[in-house]
């Protein structure tokens, strides 16, 4: 019984260490641009293609839902003019980076795991190693950089679409004036908020690619093992993202003075 209890934490620590090692190997191969730049462009296009439309379909109604809550609360306090400021803070600081990360992990990350996992069970990874081709530099490095790059584009797209959805709901449904909505943008928002949003998106995209590539490289058990690796990769990525998001948000509030 004691062995069964202690084996779980040991497995988690070992998995985390292996993921960290894979990510370090991927970062180490970044200077070898000649090896990975073509695959990097292909992965950027693929991730953007599979995530752009879903992220738009999510961000617009998501912005409307936030506008519903913020607008109702502001009306109760008699502070409708603060609706725009609260909307920008909610979307730019938290909603946009997290939504971007979840889409990259769910759509792009699952495809990465399935692709690398399929190569693994067909012994293509072993064949690359036999031919002295580093699978980390060839497969992992371009995906790490591609997911991080596309995340920067998607977080901007989510922010604009979410604020547009919030504008439609606040102005047309809740009858907040357009001037009050837009004037609130500068009341509480500051430039570090935008940098924080971009930093979160980059880190979350990197985490999604790191976990996905790792689960693909170490999957076992044939086609069923690939499916299990895809499911595990998505779940682990979500856990990492929410944990890292808490840490980054805490550090941001501790280091950056707020406009209140």
Task: Set out the residue ranges of the language-model regions.
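Active-site cofactor/substrate anionic-group-binding motifs, chiefly glycine-
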Residues: 45-99, 103
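Hydrophobic alpha-helical transmembrane segments of multi-pass membrane transport proteins
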Residues: 83-126, 211
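Short, membrane-interfacial amphipathic segments enriched in basic
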Residues: 2-38, 215-220
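Membrane-interfacial helix-loop-helix connectors in multipass membrane proteins
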Residues: 69-93, 160-202, 210-232, 251-260
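Membrane-interface helix starts
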Residues: 32-57, 238
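Start (N-cap) of specific transmembrane helices in multi-pass transporter permeases
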Residues: 134-155, 229, 233
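Short cytoplasmic-facing helical segments at TM-TM junctions of multi-pass membrane proteins
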Residues: 118-141, 223-226
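Hydrophobic alpha-helical transmembrane segments in multi-pass membrane proteins
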Residues: 50-63, 97-106, 146-167, 196-209, ...
């Amino acid at each position: 019984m004691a062995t069964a209890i202690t084996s779980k934490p040991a497995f988690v620590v070992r998995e985390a260490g292996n993921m960290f090692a894979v990510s370090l190997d991927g970062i180490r191969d970044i200077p070898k641009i000649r090896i990975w730049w073509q695959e990097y462009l292909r992965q950027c296009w693929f991730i953007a293609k599979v995530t752009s439309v879903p992220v738009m379909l999510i961000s617009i109604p998501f912005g409307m839902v936030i506008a519903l809550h913020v607008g109702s609360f502001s009306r109760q306090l008699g502070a409708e003019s603060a609706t725009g400021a609260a909307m920008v803070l909610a979307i730019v600081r938290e909603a946009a980076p997290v939504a971007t990360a979840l889409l990259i992990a769910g759509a792009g990350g699952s495809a990465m795991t399935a692709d690398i996992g399929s190569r693994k069970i067909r012994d293509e990874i072993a064949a690359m190693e036999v031919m002295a081709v580093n699978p980390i530099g060839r497969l992992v490095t371009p995906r790490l950089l591609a997911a991080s790059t596309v995340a920067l584009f998607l977080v901007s797209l989510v922010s604009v679409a979410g604020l547009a959805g919030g504008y439609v709901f606040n102005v047309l449904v809740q009858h907040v004036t357009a001037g009050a909505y837009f004037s609130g943008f500068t009341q509480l928002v500051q430039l570090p908020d935008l940098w924080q949003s971009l930093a979160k998106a980059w880190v979350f995209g990197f985490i999604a690619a790191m976990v996905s590539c790792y689960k693909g490289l170490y999957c076992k058990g044939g086609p069923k093992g690939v499916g299990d690796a895809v499911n595990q990769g998505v779940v682990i990525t979500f856990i990492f993202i929410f944990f890292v998001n808490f840490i980054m948000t805490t550090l941001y509030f501790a280091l950056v003075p707020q406009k209140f």
